[in-house]
Amino acid sequence: MDHTRDPCPWVILNDFGGAFAMGAIGGTIWHGIKGFRNSPYGERRIGAITAIKMRAPALGGNFGVWGGLFSTFDCAIKGLRNHKEDPWNSILAGFFTGGALAVRGGYKAARNGAIGCAVLLAVIEGVGIGFQKMLAGATKLEAPAPPPSNEKVLA
């Protein structure tokens, strides 16, 4: 069991805040550029600021909800699996998160959202494992050369 991480309630809050910040910052950049480009020539700065104020907080909230739900499901799955740490936790948490976020759209939307999110998390986990194995192979230590033998000295 990993004792270096915070307990699950704090991990959930931390992940929610981090996801909200990522969404708000990304939304500021995205909607700022979009508002700037779609405004008339003399009002581009005002158009960018207006677009940021209208849309960036909503995008931050959407990212925050996703991060909070994912972290909640991840902690719940770890608890159900006796605190086992492996990629299946993230894949299952992604499955439940995608399904929960799409459940208002009906059964098919929930199913497709769950499968899509699980596949996305499986790809992310697979790439992470691949990079770990690739980088671990580059750091293997070579055995040192044996010391010279003393046969000539004894003869």
UniProtKB/Swiss-Prot annotation:
Disulfide bonds: 8-75
Entry superkingdom: Eukaryota
One Pfam family hit: Tim17
Keyword Transport: yes
GO cellular component: TIM23 mitochondrial import inner membrane translocase complex
Main location: mitochondrion
A single BP term in Gene Ontology: mitochondrial genome maintenance
Topology relative to the membrane: Multi-pass membrane protein
Record function comment: Essential component of the TIM23 complex, a complex that mediates the translocation of transit peptide-containing proteins across the mitochondrial inner membrane.
Family label: Belongs to the Tim17/Tim22/Tim23 family.
Summary of subunit composition and partner proteins: Component of the TIM23 complex, at least composed of tim23, tim17, tim50 and tim21. The complex interacts with the tim44 component of the PAM complex.
The name this protein goes by in its record: Mitochondrial import inner membrane translocase subunit tim17
Source organism per UniProt: Neurospora crassa (strain ATCC 24698 / 74-OR23-1A / CBS 708.71 / DSM 1257 / FGSC 987)
Gene: tim17
